[in-house]
Every structure is written in C-alpha cells, then in structure tokens.
Regions:
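A charged, well-structured terminal subsegment
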Residues: 2-27
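Non-transmembrane, aqueous-exposed alpha-helical and coiled segments at domain scale
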Residues: 32-189
C-alpha cells in the first residue's frame, strides 16, 4: 500500500524538484530604486555598526569597512562607468547591482579603487548564464565561487598566485572573495 502511494506521488515530486522555479524568477525587483542607493547615518561604536548592518541584512555579520560617502566616491574613481548603471540582476532575488553598489561592497570588503575594474570584470564573469549563479547559490550542496585571474593584472594589483594564494595573507584575494560573497548574499538574497 505504501509503495503504491509513493509510486503515485513520485511524478509530481520529480516535476517539482526538477522544474519548479519561484513565480518571480527572472523578473526585475522594482519596489526599491537601485540608484541612488539609500544613505543612512549610523552612530555608535564600530561594533554597533557591524550589528546594525547585519540586523538590516546589509552585511554578512563579519567585520566590514564602513562604506562612507567619501570612501564610496573614492572607489568610484577606479572606473569611468556611470554609478547608476545596473550591471547585474543578482539571482535568486534578482536584486539590482549598480556600479555604485559594486563600489560600496568593494569598500566594505576592503578593496581599493584600483580594484574596481577587476570587481566589475568578476561581476561580468559571474553573471554569464553558463556559470549558473542561481543554481550554485540555491543548492543544498556545498559550493563556493571560484575565480581564475591571469595576466599582468596579478602583479599590478598584488593578487596572490603562488603558494598560499588561498591563505589568509593575500589581502587582495581575500577582499575580492569577500566582495563577491557580499554581493551574492546581500544583493542576490
């Protein structure tokens, strides 16, 4: 009797597991304008800043560099792109990632203005459909984004590429990795 019930239910379970998509998947989130980003003033200690940003789902709860207007403006000097340009609708929530938000999350992750072209290139790479960002960020399997960067930019930006490049003493590697995690977790949802 149990087997018959399971066999009867299996086609619907299989269909839901392999073809289901959220009803809003692929649609742009329009309830909040992407640019200019909302400005807020937070007073208190650095620990208060980290706690408040985490409570409001603006960070992952780990330490960040405060994205002050001055720091974001300095970061934007690393690109000629318009700050209002939407560079990616980040799955699965399809949050709008603008150039200004790339700069903001770059600051928070510890990146420098000279890293902006790399951050924008990373975004461009991860939004490629062949990467399947949505699949890798919504699976229950253990996944982690991986970037392969090559060429003169490695030495120019101080990107580690020898022994220990995945270790903690490679600040550019760590900052760029933290940046993409913040974008995925906060903008993508």
């Amino acid at each position: 009797e149990v087997r018959a019930k399971a066999e009867k239910a299996f086609p619907a379970i299989y269909e839901a597991a392999t073809h289901w998509k959220p009803k809003d998947a692929g649609k742009e989130v329009k309830d909040v304008p992407a640019y200019p980003a909302k400005r807020v003033k937070i007073t208190g200690t650095y620990a208060d800043l980290i706690r408040i940003m985490y409570q409001r789902k603006w960070s992952a709860g780990l330490p960040v560099i405060p994205p002050t207007p001055e720091a974001v403006a300095a970061m934007l000097k690393g690109t000629k792109k318009d700050p209002s340009e939407i560079v990616w609708l980040v799955p699965p929530r399809m949050g709008q990632l603008t150039v200004e938000l790339v700069a903001t999350y770059g600051v928070m992750a510890g990146c420098k203005p000279e890293h902006m072209p790399l951050l924008l290139a990373v975004v461009e790479a991860f939004k490629n459909p062949s990467v399947d960002w949505q699949g890798s960020t919504t699976t229950t399997a253990a996944t982690v984004p991986v970037m392969v960067i090559s060429g003169p930019i490695l030495d120019k930006l101080g990107i580690g590429y020898s022994s220990g490049e995945l270790g903690s003493f490679m600040p550019v590697n760590t900052s760029v990795g933290y940046f993409i995690n913040l974008v995925g977790d906060i903008i993508g949802g």
